[in-house]
UniProtKB/Swiss-Prot annotation:
This is Phospholipase A1 2. Gene3D superfamilies: alpha/beta hydrolase (3.40.50.1820). InterPro entries: AB_hydrolase_fold, Allerg_PlipaseA1, Lipase, Lipase_N, TAG_lipase. It comes from the Eukaryota. Disulfide bonds join 6-90, 179-184, 247-271, 248-296, 264-269. PROSITE patterns: LIPASE_SER (PS00120). Keywords: Allergen, Disulfide bond, Hydrolase, Lipid degradation, Lipid metabolism, Secreted. Coiled coil: none annotated. GO terms for cellular component: extracellular space. The active site is at residues 140, 168, 232. The lineage of its organism: Eukaryota, Metazoa, Ecdysozoa, Arthropoda, Hexapoda. Expressed by the venom gland. Its EC number is 3.1.1.32.
Length: 303
C-alpha cells in the first residue's frame, strides 16, 4: 500500500559502538556482539557506557549524534553505543510519507525500549559492565524509548538505571499519557529533562529535574519557518555543549525566575548536563540561553 511501513524488526536493530580507539564507530547488531570476539579479553567493569537514542526520521549517523559522541569521547575514555532504529523511525520512507508514519513510529518505541533493556542486561551479566556506569540519552521519540527501556529494565530486578537524560521528549501522542505510557521520573534514579519546543515536545514536567530552556519553546536563533524543528533538535546541541564545557547552562529554580544566573549558588541552581545530579536541588528550572553555539549562559561562572 501507499502508507509508510516504518517496519521494525527488533533483531535487525543495529548500533554504532564508538571508543577512543575507534572514534568512527563499528556498526553492529546484537547477534554479532553475542557471537563476536569483540570484548573477549576486555575488562569493561571500569567503562562508562552511555546509550544514545535518536528520534523520529533520524538515525545514529545523524551529525548531531556524531558530535555528541565525539564530545563524550573527548571528555572520557568510555564506550558510546548509539542505537540505530531508523527503519522503525520512518527514516527510509519516501519523503512525503515519512510524516504520515509518525503513529507507527510511536508504536515502535516500546520494542526499541525493550531491546535496550535486554542489551544492557547482556552488558552487565556477560561483559561485567557496572549498572552504575550506564546512562541513557534520548531525543524526541528516543527520550520516550529511554523511558520504556527504564521500565523494562526494572523487570529484571537488577536495580534501576542511574540516569536517563530526555532531550525534548516527543509530545504528540504522549502529552496526555500517564507514567506507564511515557517517560517518567521513576524510570531511573535520576531523570533529567530538557524542554526546548512546546509543540514537538511538551511543557509538562516529567523528570527529577526539568530544564525549561528559554521557557521551553522557541529557541533563540531558530528562524520562524523551521522554528519548531530547529528548537526541537536544539536540545541535542545544548547537551553536547554542556558536555564540552562545564556548567555551560545554569538553571534557575522556576520559583526564583527571573533571578539572574550570576546570583546562582550551588545549593539552589543546577548545571544542565552530565553533572546535574551532583546538585542538591530538584524540580523545575528556567534556563536562559544564547542564540549561537556554545549557547552558554554562565559567563565563565562555575557553581
Amino acid at each position: 500500500g501507499i502508507l509508510p511501513e516504518c517496519k521494525l524488526v527488533p533483531e535487525e536493530i543495529s548500533f554504532v559502538l564508538s571508543t577512543r580507539e575507534n572514534r568512527d564507530g563499528v556498526y553492529l547488531t546484537l547477534q554479532k556482539l553475542k557471537n563476536g570476539k569483540m570484548f573477549k579479553n576486555s575488562d569493561l567493569s571500569s567503562k562508562k557506557v552511555p546509550f544514545l537514542i535518536h528520534g523520529f526520521i533520524s538515525s545514529a549517523t545523524n551529525k548531531n549524534y556524531a558530535d555528541m559522541t565525539r564530545a563524550l569521547l573527548d571528555k572520557d575514555d568510555i564506550m558510546v553505543i548509539s542505537i540505530d532504529w531508523r527503519d522503525g523511525a520512518c527514516s527510509n520512507e519516501f519523503a512525503l510519507l515519512k510524516f504520515i508514519g509518525y503513529p507507527k513510529a510511536v508504536e515502535n518505541t516500546r520494542a526499541v525500549g525493550k531491546y535496550i533493556a535486554d542489551f544492557s542486561k547482556i552488558l552487565i551479566q556477560k561483559y561485567k559492565v557496572l549498572l552504575e556506569n550506564i546512562r541513557l540519552i534520548g531525543h524526541s521519540l528516543g527520550a520516550q524509548i529511554a523511558g520504556f527501556a527504564g521500565k523494562e529494565f526494572q523487570r529484571f530486578k537488577l536495580g534501576k538505571y542511574p540516569e536517563i537524560i530526555g532531550l525534548d521528549p516527543a509530545g504528540p501522542s504522549f502529552k496526555k499519557k500517564d507514567c506507564p505510557e511515557r517517560i517518567c521520573e521513576t524510570d531511573a534514579h535520576y531523570v533529567q529533562i530538557l524542554h526546548t519546543s512546546s509543540n514537538l515536545g511538551t511543557e509538562r514536567t516529567l523528570g527529577t529535574v526539568d530544564f525549561y530552556i528559554n521557557d521551553g519553546s522557541n529557541q533563540p536563533g531558530c528562524t520562524y519557518i523551521i522554528g519548531e524543528t530547529c528548537s526541537h533538535t536544539r536540545a541535542v546541541k545544548y547537551l553536547t555543549e554542556c558536555i564540552r564545557r562545564e556548567c555551560c547552562l545554569i538553571g534557575v529554580p522556576q520559583s526564583k525566575n527571573p533571578q539572574p544566573v550570576s546570583k546562582c549558588t550551588r545549593n539552589e541552581c543546577v548545571c544542565v548536563g552530565l553533572n546535574a545530579k551532583e546538585y542538591p536541588k530538584k524540580g523545575s528550572f528556567y534556563v536562559p540561553v544564547e542564540a549561537k553555539a556554545p549557547f552558554c549562559n554562565n559567563n565563565g561562572k562555575i557553581i
